[in-house]
Amino acid sequence: LINIFFTAVKFIHIIIIRNYKGVNMAIKVLVYNEDSNDIEAYYLEESDTMPYATEGSITVGEFRGSSNSPTIWTTKGLMECWNTLREQWGSPIEVRYAFKRLWEGGHGAQSQHYAGTAMDMAQSFSPEDRDELRIIAELIGCFVYVEPAYLTPTWVHVDRRLNPPACAAGYIMVREGSINTYVLILQDALNTLGFTGAGLDGVFGVGTKDALMAYQESRGLTPDGIAGCETWTYLTSEVRGMGSTDTTVL
């Protein structure tokens, strides 16, 4: 195990390389650490445990699920909530769907799955066990949202979204200085549409602002460089499920 630390002005990248020779084949896992307001980067194999998760409780491959992306992201807070839920349940919990990138689609236009803050689980459980798991997820008070059974009767959806949303049930407003996984969604969408310069690091800097303003101006939106309700609505509707492009940062 090799740990390499890179320190920048406002954030820290932590790169963990388990197999240096195979790093190009590894999955890049970006984690937003709410405690330090940093983005951490890990290079892991699909069989490795997710960062901050209890050893062996959920692998990178399980969290990646049906996504084909070589880069995925989540938050420390979600993984800590998962640890508590798993501990309270006392036995393995199947997770079939967690992460997707916006251009891959598969969920609603402003789904928390694209932010890496949502998990769909317990698909193979009995209805009674799913009901019990929902109750536990509510009682631990860690998840921001636990979907009621009448909406997802054959699985349990939990998420740890950030609030308040710019639009009802949507994403938070992000602007220059923001650091979180919603910035990653924004950067990913802009890159995919050809508005490059933002990178894919979860840090809303000058490059992200310039790319966003160019997008807003091209779509007849107020070019204020802020991703609010109107911009999120246009951008997510346009990119969701369109597939990657030559300018997508994978």
Residue ranges and their predicted role:
Residues 1, 69-73, 178, 199:
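Short, surface-exposed alpha-helical recognition segments that flank or form part
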Residues 1-24:
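Short, Lys/Arg-enriched N-terminal segments with co-localized hydrophobic residues
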Residues 3, 8-9, 60, 197, ...:
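N-terminal compositionally biased, intrinsically disordered segments and leader/signal-like regions
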Residues 26-94:
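Active-site acidic/histidine clusters and adjacent loop/turn architecture
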Residues 28-34, 108-118, 123-194, 198, ...:
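Catalytic cores and adjacent binding grooves of peptidoglycan-active enzymes
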Residues 86-115, 134-135:
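Active-site-adjacent substructure of cysteine-protease-like catalytic cores
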Residues 216:
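DNA major-groove recognition helix of helix-turn-helix
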